Amino acid sequence: MASEGDKLMGGRFVGSTDPIMQMLSTSMSTEQRLSEVDIQASIAYAKALEKAGILTKTELEKILSGLEKISEEWSKGVFVVTQSDEDIHTANERRLKELIGDIAGKLNTGRSRNEQVVTDLKLFMKNSLSVISTHLLQLIKTLVERAAIEIDVILPGYTHLQKAQPIRWSQFLLSHAVALTRDSERLGEVKRRINVLPLGSGALAGNPLDIDREMLRSELDFASISLNSMDAISERDFVVEFLSVATLLMIHLSKMAEDLIIYSTSEFGFLTLSDAFSTGSSLMPQKKNPDSLELIRSKAGRVFGRLASILMVLKGLPSTYNKDLQEDKEAVFDVVDTLTAVLQVATGVISTLQISKENMEKALTPEMLSTDLALYLVRKGMPFRQAHTASGKAVHLAETKGITINNLTLEDLKSISPLFSSDVSQVFNFVNSVEQYTAMGGTAKSSVTTQIEHLRELMKKQKEQA
């Protein structure tokens, strides 16, 4: 139980904090991850205090020496957390006093935990988003380079989980890569909005000591300085934006995982996952389960929940700082860890899976070329709606005869439309089918190659900004 003397603001209070209240209030177990950035921010603030004449040069040197010692203790895992440490700020402040005495109390002159915590969180997120961006770009690169290698593989494309039209395997891979590039762009946008310094805002009214905030900005490598102190210490837009971007990213990863799970089933047999990303059954020896993909899919729900929870926290808050905001860090840390793990696993899955070109080609059926049959008539001058009807009649006639559409005779087809001639046989070729989609974004080889080149250039730009 914290005694009156243990309280950071003990002068105002008589008696001890209720132990249950203390347990509810403390965030120390979560905030230990902020230890290094908290010290980093304190070092910058100490230098600003010295420039403002609050600290002497000797006092600054003692404070910096103490902070460096604390940083070393955290890095070596020997920092001792006490029961009275409510959060990372009080823990570091308490330890600094133990090391250098009462001079430590000068460090927080004009500084509030309200500004400390948001500064720490922004510093942490700047670093974390750079790591996540790197992992995301590696996944995109893996998809793109695999698409380049396996560009000649053709398989069924699906809508409503029913066979629709032939596509290149590369077109499938690139569809996911393109979605992920949007996530990469959004991460960059969030990082730019995080990059605004709140330190120097005080509890809410600002800093009264003529602190040089431009110096703080430079020391902590922020791009700009917050404009309004009340907004700076309370805004968590950047948390919501990050969790929103993470939610969209997980939607895309979940979709990709679901596609690959389906394609890996024995019913499809299009691909096989590496043993490194599969598990077995505790009962059935023959099983090879796609647990890696299932976990990616399930982690999406976890991230969605974090976004929903922080939105509920923020919804009813009045202006400036409220203790409710303590919930933001757990959400951020959890999602950072989830994305970091999921992106690396997804990259591993994509880089090691083996495709079955034979099974993909076997799954191609003549009925998938019904659209091509309609387009054949369009090229002969028939309006598309009439051509669509004519092709549908051909499908029905083939079903009635118990044969595939490509086995209808020329006479059968002419009974539907006199525009059919002997060159209709060229329609029933899967390579010809995919090669007609030459418009930008299509599944023709030339178009897919253009997509690959474009994505490579885009990745270069995004890597420079990560």
From Swiss-Prot:
Pfam families: ASL_C2, Lyase_1
EC number: 4.3.2.1
Reaction(s) catalysed by this chain's protein: 2-(N(omega)-L-arginino)succinate = fumarate + L-arginine
Its job: Delta crystallin, the principal crystallin in embryonic lens, is found only in birds and reptiles. This protein also functions as an enzymatically active argininosuccinate lyase.
Lineage, opening ranks: Eukaryota, Metazoa, Chordata, Craniata, Vertebrata
InterPro entries, per the entry: Arg_succ_lyase_C, Argininosuccinate_lyase, Fumarase/histidase_N, Fumarate_lyase_CS, Fumarate_lyase_fam, Fumarate_lyase_N, L-Aspartase-like
Binding site for 2-(N(omega)-L-arginino)succinate: S27, N114, T159, N289, Y321, Q326, K329
GO biological-process terms attached to the record: arginine biosynthetic process via ornithine; L-arginine biosynthetic process
Site features described as Increases basicity of active site His, chain residue numbers: E294
Keywords assigned by UniProt, alphabetized: Amino-acid biosynthesis, Arginine biosynthesis, Eye lens protein, Lyase
Domain of life from the UniProt record: Eukaryota
GO molecular function: argininosuccinate lyase activity; structural constituent of eye lens
Pathway: Amino-acid biosynthesis; L-arginine biosynthesis; L-arginine from L-ornithine and carbamoyl phosphate: step 3/3
Subunit-level organization: Homotetramer.
GO CC terms of this entry: cytosol
PANTHER family from the UniProt entry: ARGININOSUCCINATE LYASE (PTHR43814:SF1)
Active site: H160 (proton acceptor), S281 (proton donor)
Enzyme class label: lyase
Family: Belongs to the lyase 1 family. Argininosuccinate lyase subfamily.
Tissue expression from the record: Eye lens.
Gene3D superfamilies according to UniProt: Fumarase/aspartase (C-terminal domain) (1.10.40.30), Fumarase/aspartase (Central domain) (1.20.200.10), Fumarase/aspartase (N-terminal domain) (1.10.275.10)
Protein's UniProt name: Argininosuccinate lyase
